[in-house]
Amino acid sequence: MPKRKRTGLSSLGTLITAMSISLMACGAIMSLNSSCDNDSPSFSDDNHTGQTEHFPGLETVTLPEDLYSQIKEYIGFTISFNKDNKTPNYVAWELLGDEVKNDIDRTDNFWTDPDIEGCPSTKDYTRSGYDRGHMCPAADQKWSIEAMNDCFVMANICPQDHKLNAGAWNTLENKERQWAKRDSAIMIIAGPLYSADDTNRIGNAKVRVPGAFFKVLLAPYVEEPRGIAFVYPNMTSPDNMQDYAMSIDELEKITGYDFFPALPDELEKTVESSFSFKEWNNSK
């Protein structure tokens, strides 16, 4: 994932050293994930350079060998694009708590990337009956004009039911921003889900309409790292978030994808094998 320039700690070794000094000042040797006041450590402001600098490769997803994938890194996110579906396989990005406080204006300037094979045009969605649904939402890219512009690339877009886009999916996106502020940073991976029955296509480019959408969340900087996944059908969906929640392992069985293969094995097992919506929704 492209590195965003921030001041502060530049490596995990520096991070450990700085935290060790802080912990010794508390009068006790504590684990890396502890703090003097028993709250989750804060990596915001000048002490957070972005989680992918400390856990390299979190944006990487291992896909089935027979699935076409063209990877491209944009300013604030990474896309795996599928030229057959004319939609992304997935879009991955980190969201820092401080970034959601910024106020770069939304552009709505959708554009076709000539470097992406099969990237559709915004006209392919015109009068299709579907929204141009962002996988990485514009509201997550308000920290940079360039990131905001990149967010409107058509490679980041899928045909999405309007009531889902403006309803339950939007509710989840808003909740993610709250969680990012609370947890200092979260990793997000989102994309469409297709089955053999999903044969509908729109526009001259024949953009394939997905039957559902998935989202994977990881909070690695809390006292007990946690993960969760969601699957929403591409239709009007009741706004009851926990009904769409599942473990990351469950989603991996559905998609055939391997999320967060760069994590240490034990940590990956911990965050992927189970989930607690209550912990995500209520943790302080």
Language-model segment annotations:
Residues P2-K284:
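Domain-level detector for secreted/extracellular nuclease and nuclease-toxin modules, and
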